[in-house]
């Protein structure tokens, strides 16, 4: 991120940095084993705190200032921010609802069943990748946002998420994964898994890239929308992408993927961010009136992801207190970064 260049170029540099941090986090799969849940849960908690702080200081605060200073909304200056924030959350929610209709529910091999430290998980040899049997106490891994999509723990008791239930998987003892038509053929199954994998990754990593792009596109539009603010946002998202890369690659390694393949899919989760960042910067440069909506949209998407995905995932293995304090630490670090360097 070099001051003095165009907003679009800055957004490209910023999102390349966030992608690189994702890859660096995914590379830890070469160091840690899949059973080290405390590290993963603490990292996810830290990422949640960073995202919440970045959502306010780098996105919502400039959006509110723009809506207020424009004078066009008067006492209703909150309206564009509220609309954008709600639309951002709705975007991620609807994307999650759409996934089963795009075929994710038809091919259970896109959802990897994991049971850390358990012998209940059985693997079936497959030249294209591991086909798994679903154990009774499973952790369903969604590739993309924070890796895990699972039975959550609430006060120590497991409960089934609606998203996991949407796949139609019954509770009970391990049963073989059924094959459907041409999915039994290795070639077709492999391409289908890859296509759905890329789709899931794209949907769930757009908000971060969009936030960085919109942040750089908004530079000098208000007093709080500065280069330093946009740079700090990119650094903050890069920091929280580090554990996210690990959260994708580590479960994949535990599911039977090779270390290099787990690393590849882990870093792939950040590859879409440069595209989303450039799009966000272009959009706000060409259409300045949408800036408050765009900033709030990115914030809403990020906050929804934290509440719906990252925080619940950090609570599933009995490390809830660790994850909570890590969240506080992440929030303080990002707040200090934004205020101290802004």
UniProtKB/Swiss-Prot annotation:
Spell out where the chain crosses the membrane. Answer: 12-32, 44-64, 72-92, 194-214, 263-285, 290-307, 322-342
> In the UniProt record, which is one GO cellular component term?
plasma membrane
Which InterPro entries does the record associate with it? Answer: ZIP (IPR003689)
The entry's protein name is Zinc transporter ZIP11
Q: Can you state which reaction this protein catalyses?
A: Zn(2+)(in) = Zn(2+)(out); Cu(2+)(in) = Cu(2+)(out)
Q: Which UniProt keywords apply?
A: Cell membrane, Cytoplasm, Golgi apparatus, Ion transport, Membrane, Nucleus, Transmembrane, Transmembrane helix, Transport, Zinc, Zinc transport
Give a GO biological-process term. Answer: zinc ion transmembrane transport
Family from the record: Belongs to the ZIP transporter (TC 2.A.5) family.
What's this protein's function? Zinc importer that regulates cytosolic zinc concentrations either via zinc influx from the extracellular compartment or efflux from intracellular organelles such as Golgi apparatus. May transport copper ions as well. The transport mechanism remains to be elucidated.
Q: What is its main location?
A: membrane
GO molecular function annotations of the record = copper ion transmembrane transporter activity; zinc ion transmembrane transporter activity
Compartment list: Cell membrane; Nucleus; Cytoplasm; Golgi apparatus
At the top level, the lineage of the source is Eukaryota
Q: Does the keyword Nucleotidyltransferase apply?
A: no
Q: How does it sit in the membrane?
A: Multi-pass membrane protein
């Amino acid at each position: 991120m070099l001051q003095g260049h165009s907003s679009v170029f800055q957004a490209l540099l910023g999102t390349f940095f966030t992608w690189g941090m994702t890859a660096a986090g995914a590379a830890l799969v070469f160091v840690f084993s899949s059973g080290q849940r405390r590290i993963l849960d603490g990292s996810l908690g830290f990422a949640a705190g960073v995202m919440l702080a970045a959502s306010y200081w780098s996105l919502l605060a400039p959006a509110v200032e723009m809506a207020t200073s424009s004078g066009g909304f008067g006492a209703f200056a909150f309206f564009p921010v509220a609309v954008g924030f709600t639309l951002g959350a709705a975007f991620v929610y609807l994307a999650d609802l759409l996934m089963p209709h795009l075929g994710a529910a038809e091919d259970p091999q896109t959802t990897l069943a994991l049971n850390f430290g358990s012998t209940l998980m059985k693997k079936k040899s497959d030249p294209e990748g591991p086909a798994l049997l679903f154990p009774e106490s499973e952790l369903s891994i969604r590739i993309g946002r924070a890796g895990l999509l699972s039975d959550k723990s609430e006060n120590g008791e497991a409960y089934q998420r609606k998203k996991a239930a949407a796949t139609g998987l019954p509770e009970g003892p391990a049963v073989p994964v059924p094959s459907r038509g041409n999915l039994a053929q290795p070639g077709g199954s492999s391409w289908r898994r890859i296509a759905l994998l890329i789709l899931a990754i794209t949907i769930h990593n757009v908000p971060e890239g969009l936030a960085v792009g919109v942040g750089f596109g908004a530079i000098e539009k208000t007093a709080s929308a500065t280069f330093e603010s946009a740079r700090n946002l990119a650094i903050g998202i890069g920091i929280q992408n580090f554990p996210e890369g690990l959260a994708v690659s580590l479960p994949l390694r535990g599911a039977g993927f090779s270390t290099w393949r787990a690393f590849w899919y882990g870093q792939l989760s950040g590859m879409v961010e440069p595209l989303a960042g450039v799009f966000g910067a272009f959009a706000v440069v060409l259409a300045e009136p949408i800036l408050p909506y765009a900033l709030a949209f990115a914030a809403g998407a990020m906050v929804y992801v934290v509440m719906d995905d990252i925080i619940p995932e950090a609570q599933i293995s009995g490390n809830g207190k660790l994850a909570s304090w890590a969240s506080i630490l992440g929030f303080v670090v990002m707040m200090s970064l934004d205020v101290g360097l802004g």
